[in-house]
Amino acid sequence: MEHHIGCMDVDVNNNIKPTELIKCIQETANGQMNARKPSYFELFWDRKSFIITRFSMEIYEQIHQFDDIETRTWTAGERGATFFRGYEVMRNGRCVARASGDWAVVDTEDGHIYKTKEIDLSNYESGDKPELNINEKFRIPKNMEMEGCGVHHVVLSECDMNMHMNNTQYANILWNQIDGILDKEITSFNIKFRAEAKFDSDIMIMRGVPAVGKKSKSGEKANAADGSDANHVNSDDQNQDGLIIPKYGDRAADELAVFRTETGGKTNVEAVFGLRVIKR
C-alpha cells in the first residue's frame, strides 16, 4: 500500500511521528484482510475480532514530509492462539523500517480466545517472520523505579469499533512523555499489550528513562556493528543506577525510554523506545 507523508504526519524535526507510521502499517493489514478475506467486518459481525498482544518495530532511516512510502505485510506463521504478522516500510526501493506483530482472535461478547486452527487465514499472503535486532520479548525489571508522568483520558476519536483505544494510539501518547524528545529521534518501538483501555477510562502513565549503552559489564565502551567506538545500546542495556533491560539489542540507540501504564487497576501496556540524539 502506498502512502504520501504530509505535514500533519511529522514532528518538529520533520520525522514521522510513531503513531502515524504504525497507522500506515496497520492500515495495510486491514487492506489485505478486506481484499483477501476474511475482512475485519466479516469477523466483527461474527463476534470475532483481532487483538494485538505485542508489536515491535525498528526504524533504520527517518521518514519525512513529502516522502512516498510503500508498506507491505504478510502473515508469518502461528502457534497456539497467536498469529504472527510481518511488516516492511519501503522508500525508493530501500527498507527504512521493519516490524513484527503478535495477534489473537477473541469473541467480542464473552472474551473467548480462539485457537489458530479455528480461524482460516489461508487466503492472506504469507511469509517468514521478520528477524529484528531488538528483543521482542523484553521485560521491565521489577526493581526498576517508575515515576508517574501523566494521565490520559480515552476519548471516542481514539477508539475502534470494540470501544477500546486503538493500539496505534499508544505510541504517540507515550512518545509525548519522553524527556528531551525535541532533540531525539526514534530507532525502535516495542510494546506489550496487557489489558485494553475502554472508552472514557483513564490511563495512568509511569516512566523510567535509563541512560543505557554507556558501558558493558567489563567497563568497556560499547562498539557499533562496524567495530567503531559508539554510545550504542549493548547486551547489558543499563542505566545509571544499574537497572537493566536485558539484552534489548537496539545498537542504533543512544538511550532507551521505558514506560508502563495502568487502567482500571490493571497493567495496560509496557513499552520501550530506542532513541538517538539528533546531530544538528
Language-model segment annotations:
Residues M1, E58-I59, I63-R139, A197-F199, ...:
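HotDog/MaoC-like acyl-thioester-processing domains
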Residues M1-I52, R98, D107-T187, T267-E270, ...:
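Hot-dog-fold acyl-thioester-processing enzymes
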Residues T53, F83-R85, T187, I203:
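Residue-level marker for the onset of beta-strands and adjacent loop->beta junctions
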Residues T53-I59, T71, S188-F193:
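Short structured motifs
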Residues L174-P210, T261:
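Glycine/small-residue-rich hydrophobic helix-like segments
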